[in-house]
């Protein structure tokens, strides 16, 4: 192979890797001048069409006379060839360094990938951590406490409802007792009115009795005066009285009878009045005693009801305070449980994000590993191509360049240049593709044959 073919291949390799081409002073004009004067070999496999055209041009014999041999041009060509050779060696050394760095990076990424795969397998295979068990146990205990508090709350609500029913019943009894008390007070007012009426009647009867007694006294006095007058008149006229007594009925007996009748009537009236008054007073006293006893019992019941109402009110207030405290405690516990659950959810979310991040990192490492494998295979292909090119170049450079000048000096005319021998090299390249599907690695392998052409 010619050095121009090697130069075109190295340039294409530098374009593949993104490096800047190395400037060379070996221009096309110098190659043309060299081929025109010395009949240099045709270019390599960089372009088959150009090489064939170059063969056609170089197939015509070029005769160079001894007089026109330009040693300065040969020396310039040798110097340019040495410069190109040194540049190619530097480029090859740089490519080798880059390839070594790529190899190191690929090994490092393979190690990281193996570590990540091991960690993922361990994370998948191992049981849930102790922290999750502790969290679940704590949540179960908190749920049990919440259920107990709910049961206590229901029990307290039932007791509160029972106390409310008892309070309503006691209020109803209180209302009934109040109505009874009002009825008793109304009856007492009526009885007092009856007592007042009876008192007035008694006073009126007493006045009547007094008036009757006064009348009886007056009648007694009148009767005594009449008796005295009669006695005086009788003593003054005894004979006449005796005569009149014989003629008229006995006045004394008549007065005695009248007096006895009046006394009987008065005593009867007094006795009847006293009996009526006593019976009425006894009835009123019994009614007053009954009413006072009922009133006293009503007052006692009312006081007892008041005491029960006060005790029940205090108990209800205490239960209300306890209920409010339990409600506040339950609310605080619910808020605390909500905050803890939110913290657990945040922790779970953070762990899931971390796992997702690790999966993304692993996928990225796998993609980088795949890209590096592709670059490695491309580098292997280009290194093989370089190796073939270098082998052909070294075999071609084995003949010293100064033989060209001696050959030109000895022969009057340059011989025809035979067409270069084309070599075909086939190489089987194994392409291994590693993909990640649903967290699992899928490895696919394909083989591809590549052919490379060269000239010797």
From Swiss-Prot:
Question: What are the start and end residues of every segment in region (Coil 1B)?
Answer: 135-230
UniProt-annotated stretches for the region Tail: 396-456
Region Head, as annotated, extends over 1-90
- Gene Ontology BP annotations: intermediate filament organization
Extract the ranges annotated as region (Coil 1A). Answer: 91-123
N-terminal signal peptide: none
* Record region (Linker 1): 124-134
Question: Per its UniProt record, what PROSITE patterns does this chain match?
Answer: IF_ROD_1, IF_ROD_2
Alphabetized SUPFAM superfamilies for the sequence: Intermediate filament protein, coiled coil region
Bias (Polar residues) ranges: 1-14
Q: Which InterPro entries match?
A: IF_conserved, IF_rod_dom, Intermed_filament_DNA-bd, Intermediate_filament, Keratin_I
Name the protein family: Belongs to the intermediate filament family.
User: What is the annotated quaternary arrangement, including any partners?
Assistant: Forms homodimers (in vitro). Homopolymerizes into a filamentous network (in vitro).
Q: What is this protein called?
A: Peripherin
What organism does the UniProt record list as the source? Xenopus laevis (African clawed frog)
Q: Which gene encodes it?
A: prph
